[in-house]
Each structure stands twice: as structure tokens, then as C-alpha cells.
Amino acid sequence: MTNFQLISDNLKEEKIEFEILWIGQSELFYKGIESTLIDKYWQFLLLNDGSLTKQLQLLKNKKIKRKLLEESPINFTTSFISYLTQPIKIPIIQRNIFLYSNEVEPLIYATSWWSENTINSFFLDKEQPIWSNLAQLKIEFYRDLRKILLINSKSLEKQFNKKGPFWSRYYLIWYNNFPITIIFEIFSPIIKV
């Protein structure tokens, strides 16, 4: 079972089921992706190393808010925990959130996995998105993009109030040569409007 398959199976447990239409591997990101596969707008958002929160704020001209859906210790399959503990130390906390520019339609659905031992040192204000917290700490970090996906999801069509397909990405954030979190983000098409 692939690492991404483990993440996908875990999200099904969270009632976020999806069908994968296309997967871009990391070697594609450095060569460049043809605009026939992904238009330049989505390439900019998906491949950018900067703060997604700040990019959304500029695009929407509104403050980006986070809605915490759930934060809890994970209790999943041995293979999923085994995959997570390769980069992230146990015990592991899973966070599910939406990012909004208003209270009506979410822009992003995200799931992240953190070591319980480090999560509080990176979240000065848990009401703010991850990138706002990391910026407040004034630390250098690296986003290690692993995959870009195009997916269909009936459950997210309801949440986003938009028809799919949806772009998504999965990456690790590194700090001081150690991975601090794994993040999976799914983008609403409303971002481009």
C-alpha cells in the first residue's frame, strides 16, 4: 500500500471520500508542468512555497479565518500510524479544518498530522491558520511537496457548494532538518472566481 493510499484511507474514516483522477509526482514539480495539465493559476497556488493563507488573503481581499472541525489523537490502522511515525513522532494529533474568507463557503479543506509533543510549540494561537502561527514564530521552514492530485468527492461538493473536480496537494513541513507535520489540502474551485 502506498503512503498516499494510507492517507486516502484515513480520510475515508473522516467521511471525506474521493476518487483520484490524476496524480502528479514530485519530480514533475521541478521540471515544470505543462499548462495543458494544470493551468498557470492553479500551478501558482499548488506549487508555491509561500504562505497559502497570505495568498488567499490577497486573492480574496479578505482576512482568512480557520474553522476547526476536529483536533484529536489518532486511533487508526497500524499501517497508517507506521507511515506517519516515519516522519512524525508519536503520539500523533490529527487536525481537520476549513479555511474561509467569509462564513459561507470554505476555500480549503485541510487535514494535518502533528506530534503531540511539538504541536503546542508551533501554535501560538490555535484560532489562526498554521501559516499565521509559523510567521509569528519568525522561523525558516521548508515545504516538501510530495504529490498534486485532481480528485472528485461528493462529500466535498456538498461542503464547498461547488461541483468537482478539486485540486489537492500533500506535503511535509520541515524545520531544523526535522519534519514537523504532514498536510493534505483540498482546494475549492471558488478560489479562482
From Swiss-Prot:
What does the UniProt entry say about where the protein is found? Plastid, Cyanelle
Indicate whether Plastid appears among the record's keywords: yes
Give the top-rank taxon of the lineage listed in the UniProt record for this protein. Answer: Eukaryota
What GO CC annotations are associated with the protein?
cyanelle
Keywords, A to Z?
Answer: Cyanelle, Plastid
InterPro entries registered for this protein in UniProt: Chorismate_lyase_/UTRA_dom_sf, Rv2949c-like
Q: Is Nucleotidyltransferase given among the entry's keywords?
A: no
UniProt-listed Gene3D superfamilies:
Chorismate lyase-like
Primary residence: plastid
The family classification in the record reads: Belongs to the ycf21 family.
Stated name of the protein: Uncharacterized protein ycf21
Q: What species does this protein belong to?
A: Cyanophora paradoxa
